[in-house]
Amino acid sequence: MDDVGRLWTGIGVCAAVILLMAFLTLCENAAVEFNDAKLKKMAEEDKDPKAIKLAALLKRTGRVVATNLIARSIMIIVVSVGGVIFFYEPISDGLYTLFNYQAPYYVSGICSFVIISCLLALVICTFGIGIPKKLCISGKVGEKFILNNCGVYKVFLAVFSPLAAVSGAVSAGILRLFGIKSTNKADSVTEQ
């Protein structure tokens, strides 16, 4: 594959994964910020099937957030690996030529790796996390979005839930080594 084709393929793969990450971020924020009283009314009184699905999903908010975190972490790894696979050689060769072959080849390799890492971090933070969160906070994306996409969101959560379960089990085991019970106090609300 030539360098131009490799670059376009890399851009396409990374963009697709970042869009999926943005979708998960939008869904998580919209679901967590959904008005509980309104959702309960829609599910129980209005018998809205979308609201019933969402209410069932949000019964375990901690698990949804943990699964979403695992999914986004895996997507960040996929984008990083894809960035190295698709962008490293063309950028490294271009930098080596730019340095007029004066520096050793590994210098251009290190520089290309740093460039790829910084650019991907910027793109992931901006388009995969920052903009979707701000869209939810501003109210542009909210209740209607999560109600319409709850089924698709549940599928993505189901795909990543085995990894979240393994991560939870490992975390619980490590916490037990330190004498800490793995009960989630964030889910229980106490009045003080």
Protein language model features and the residues they cover:
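Membrane-embedded alpha-helical segments of inner-membrane proteins
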Residues: 1-191
